[in-house]
Amino acid sequence: MDGTRTSLDIEEYSDTEVQKNQVLTLEEWQDKWVNGKTAFHQEQGHQLLKKHLDTFLKGKSGLRVFFPLCGKAVEMKWFADRGHSVVGVEISELGIREFFTEQNLSYSEEPITEIPGTKVFKSSSGNISLYCCSIFDLPRTNIGKFDMIWDRGALVAINPGDRKCYADTMLSLLGKKFQYLLCVLSYDPTKHPGPPFYVPHAEIERLFGKICNIRCLEKVDAFEERHKSWGIDCLFEKLYLLTEK
């Protein structure tokens, strides 16, 4: 793929500890949905994924694709429309319902028996299942292994102190010959407390390097006018491909 870079080409910020104690609770994330504070949602889908999607899929059908912290990501329908099975997890029931409504998909809901008080929402077509629960409770549901993970807005949203647990959860869900597509953000963490949090290349190596080959495919300027309120003047997004060693 053109635009391929190694980590050596990518600017990193040295102060990686400044955000380590930042915490957002599940209730605070749910409040963001209730109050419409979801600027992280991309109505047109993620452009880097759109650019590389057919290359990643290689004409295959019937893949199992996992969306951690899925929100109402329109990319879930991209995969479903191509004949793949999509599973997502999201703490906000509102976000899940909005996905099905905005994509004009009928759905059913049922309790998750392994996690009392939670639900799974399933499209009538049967190829989209969205679990409304904590990502850390999900392994209790025995949802199986996945061929691909699309992680955009997930690792960068996880509290820094929970990253190791999160990464171990993701690795436990990966099947043979997996593709783990990971988007992270690069900005000066001394100027913005997050989320989204700054995730440097070294952190990706620490979390996934023992199991995965790690390759940065592309780096793009992601700075928008709204980011000025964060106190920053530049923001880059990096797309990584993690594969089985």
From Swiss-Prot:
PROSITE patterns: SAM_MT_TPMT. Keywords: Acetylation, Cytoplasm, Methyltransferase, Phosphoprotein, S-adenosyl-L-methionine, Transferase. It holds the Pfam family TPMT. S-adenosyl-L-methionine binds at residues 29-40, 69, 90, 134-135, 152. Substrate binds at F40. Monomer. Its main location: cytoplasm. It catalyses: S-adenosyl-L-methionine + a thiopurine = S-adenosyl-L-homocysteine + a thiopurine S-methylether. Disulfide bonds: none annotated. The modification Phosphoserine is found at S14. It is found in: Cytoplasm. Belongs to the class I-like SAM-binding methyltransferase superfamily. TPMT family. GO terms for molecular function: S-adenosyl-L-methionine binding; thiopurine S-methyltransferase activity. GO terms for biological process: methylation; xenobiotic metabolic process. The keyword Acetylation applies. Gene3D superfamilies: Vaccinia Virus protein VP39. It comes from the Eukaryota. The keyword S-adenosyl-L-methionine applies. This is Thiopurine S-methyltransferase. PANTHER family: THIOPURINE S-METHYLTRANSFERASE (PTHR10259:SF11). GO terms for cellular component: cytoplasm. The modification N6-acetyllysine is found at K58.
